[in-house]
């Protein structure tokens, strides 16, 4: 069994878009794709965890019922897609958790940091999640890239703590589900979704999933809601590299993940833990 997390965020949330565009008071568009995503999961007999940016639940409260009543799970992705290393965010994080809990009727037990921004300097979030009764986190990419990642972190699920974010701590209370990685041309790279789903050949991703399953470990996979609904994603002007990372093969993400769901079993984090 493998794990599928959908980072449910809108078109103005991605870090590379915010980096180049001062977008305030934007109208959400990607939320209009929720029916398409739910129907797609139903057709594939697959359950997923929706890591939702909380402000979208305030804009469209019915999202909660749409997700939960179809057997899926809601996880926390901060209220405004804020990186953990933003100045003074530590003081705000607890209040956002409380607000999200109210919006979801205390249903959320899992967290994913925007842009996988968990690091030694932001490990404070683990103790706060524990205090609020959270069960797991999925913010570790066990390879270092220019945008995110923790070099040499454990690649299979482990107990995480604020003093040990990269390997098992038997005293840890939270389960960490690190994202899938693989070896490519002698180098370890991410393979668990997003840009890497769009750019890597499916044969490499299939091989990575098989390797994890061969050691009785789930492959943790993710995709952004805007990658599943590119028809709602506006094309914005950005520098060449950032434009490439955001938009390259955007139209292929849905089909590539669909083929993986037909080959391998995926479920939500909640159902896997149970």
Kindly label every feature range from the protein language model.
Residues 1-70:
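Active-site beta->alpha N-cap acidic-glycine motif
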Residues 43-45, 199-274:
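C-terminal domain-boundary segment and adjacent tail
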Residues 34-38, 61-65, 93-101, 126, ...:
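Generic structural signal for well-ordered alpha-helices
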Residues 9-11, 55-57, 80-81, 116-118, ...:
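Short, solvent-exposed loop/turn segments at secondary-structure junctions
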Residues 21-28, 47, 51-53, 79-88, ...:
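The substrate-binding groove and active-site-proximal loops of carbohydrate-active enzymes
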Residues 7, 41, 74-77, 111, ...:
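Conserved, mostly hydrophobic/aromatic
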Residues 106, 113-216:
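Active-site-adjacent pocket scaffolds in enzyme catalytic domains
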Residues 44-122, 134, 139-146, 172:
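Metal-dependent polysaccharide deacetylase catalytic core of the NodB/CE4 family, i.e.
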């Amino acid at each position: 069994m493998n794990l599928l997390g959908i980072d449910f965020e809108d078109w103005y949330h991605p870090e590379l878009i915010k980096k180049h565009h001062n977008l305030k008071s934007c109208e959400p568009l990607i939320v209009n794709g929720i029916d398409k995503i739910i129907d797609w999961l139903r057709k594939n007999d697959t359950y997923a965890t929706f890591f939702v940016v909380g402000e979208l639940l305030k804009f469209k409260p019915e999202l909660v019922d749409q997700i939960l009543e179809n057997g899926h799970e809601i996880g926390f992705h901060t209220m405004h897609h804020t990186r953990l290393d933003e100045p003074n965010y530590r003081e705000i994080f607890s209040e956002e958790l409380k607000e999200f809990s109210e919006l979801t009727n205390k249903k959320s037990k899992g967290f994913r940091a925007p842009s996988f921004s968990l690091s030694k300097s932001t490990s404070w979030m683990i103790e706060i999640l524990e205090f609020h009764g959270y069960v797991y986190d999925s913010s570790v990419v066990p390879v270092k890239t220019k945008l995110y990642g923790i070099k040499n972190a454990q690649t299979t699920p482990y107990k995480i703590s604020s003093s040990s974010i990269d390997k098992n701590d038997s005293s840890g209370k939270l389960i960490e589900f690190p994202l899938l990685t693989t070896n490519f041309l002698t180098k370890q790279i991410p393979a668990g979704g997003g840009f890497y789903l769009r750019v890597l050949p499916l044969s490499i991703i299939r091989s990575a999933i098989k390797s994890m399953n061969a050691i009785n470990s789930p492959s943790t996979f993710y995709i952004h809601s805007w990658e599943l609904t590119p028809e709602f994603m506006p094309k914005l002007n950005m520098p060449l590299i950032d434009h490439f990372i955001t938009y390259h093969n955007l139209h292929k993400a849905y089909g590539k993940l669909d083929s993986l769901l037909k080959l391998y079993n995926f479920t939500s984090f909640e159902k896997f833990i149970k």
